[in-house]
């Protein structure tokens, strides 16, 4: 007898499905907007909302450090990129501090021409404008390049000069 399956399989095995969901969640929090098929977006939406709720729990000031660490580790099971985790806990969670649910929205687009799939966009409801996101990325890159240059300069100054010794041939 067939029983009802609560998991949307997305025509993939468990490992592939989990990797797909994790990567899409990471992209959603990194770029605050992703485009994919409706079926994938519906699955990713539920997981993303749960992670935002988990990140919001860390905003409570009288929360035990063990619970805060537990929340971060639970989120890091899904999101492997540390920068995205920091963005989720420090930026995205603060934007949704007063909201109870409804952190994302799915917008329907025209069906894809090649296979007539239902396509849509999943985005955060209080999304930053594209121009501010670009400015933040440029500033971040500049900081990283300065740090790299300083690191290279310290390496060069710390390394001792190599003297060339001439070798004479034995006759």
From Swiss-Prot:
Keywords: Ribonucleoprotein, Ribosomal protein. Residues 140-171 are annotated as: Disordered. GO terms for molecular function: structural constituent of ribosome. GO terms for cellular component: cytosolic large ribosomal subunit. Residues 140-152 have a biased composition (Basic and acidic residues). Residues 156-165 have a biased composition (Polar residues). Transmembrane segments: none annotated. GO terms for biological process: translation. Pfam families: Ribosomal_L17. InterPro entries: Ribosomal_bL17, Ribosomal_bL17_CS, Ribosomal_bL17_sf. Part of the 50S ribosomal subunit. Contacts protein L32. NCBIfam families: L17 (TIGR00059). This is Large ribosomal subunit protein bL17. It comes from Leptospira interrogans serogroup Icterohaemorrhagiae serovar copenhageni (strain Fiocruz L1-130).
């Amino acid at each position: 007898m067939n029983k009802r399956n609560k998991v949307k399989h997305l025509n993939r095995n468990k490992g592939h499905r989990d990797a797909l969901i994790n990567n899409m969640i990471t992209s959603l929090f990194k770029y605050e907007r992703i485009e994919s098929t409706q079926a994938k977006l519906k699955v990713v939406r539920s997981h993303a909302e749960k992670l935002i709720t988990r990140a919001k729990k860390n905003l409570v000031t009288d929360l035990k450090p063990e619970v805060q660490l537990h929340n971060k580790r639970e989120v890091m099971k899904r999101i492997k990129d540390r920068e995205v985790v920091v963005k989720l806990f420090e930026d995205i969670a603060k934007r949704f501090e007063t909201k109870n649910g409804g952190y994302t929205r799915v917008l329907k687009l025209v069906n894809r021409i090649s296979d007539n799939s239902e396509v849509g966009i999943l985005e955060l409801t209080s999304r930053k404008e594209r121009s501010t996101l670009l400015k933040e990325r440029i500033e971040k890159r500049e900081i990283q390049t300065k740090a790299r240059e300083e690191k290279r300069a310290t390496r060069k100054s710390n390394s001792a000069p190599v003297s060339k010794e001439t070798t004479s041939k034995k006759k």
